[in-house]
Amino acid sequence: MLVRILGCSGGIGGNLRTTSMLVDQDILIDAGTGVGDLSLTELQLIDHVFLTHSHLDHVAMLPFLVDTVGGMRTSPIVVHATAETLAILKDHIFNWKIWPDFSKIPDEKNPMMRFSELKLGEPVVLGGRRFTALPANH
C-alpha cells in the first residue's frame, strides 16, 4: 500500500493544501484542495473516497472531483462516510442549490457517485486493503 500525502494543512496559499491522501491510485482519504494538483488521468483512477468528517477542508474538492470525471467513468465514485457526514453532504452540498446531486445523475440506477455508510469499528475491505473508521474528537 502506497500512501501519497496531497495536503495536510487547514488552510491554503503558497505550498499549503488542505487534508487529502491518495492510497495506491484508487482510494482517496479526504478530499482537500491537494486533490486539485492531480492530473486528469490520476483523478479518473479514484474509485473510492473515504471522508473522516464533513469540515470543508476535508470535503472541498469532492464536488469538483465527481463533476470532472464522473461522466468519463463506467462506475460511480463511492463516497464512504458516517451517516452524519453523509447527511451533511446531502443537505448542504449535493442539494441542487450548492451543487448537483451526483447520486441521481444521470439517474439513480446509474449515478456518477454513490454514498456508502461507514460504521465505526466495522472494516471496509477493498482489493485486500482494510479501512476501519475509528471515533475521533475533532
Map each language-model feature to its residues.
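Active-site metal-binding motif and surrounding structural segment of the metallo-beta-lactamase
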Residues: 34-84
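Short, acidic/polar N-cap/turn motifs at the starts of alpha helices
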Residues: 18-20, 76, 119-123
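Metallo-beta-lactamase
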Residues: 84-137
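Short capping micro-motif at the N-terminus of alpha-helices
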Residues: 29-31, 59, 133
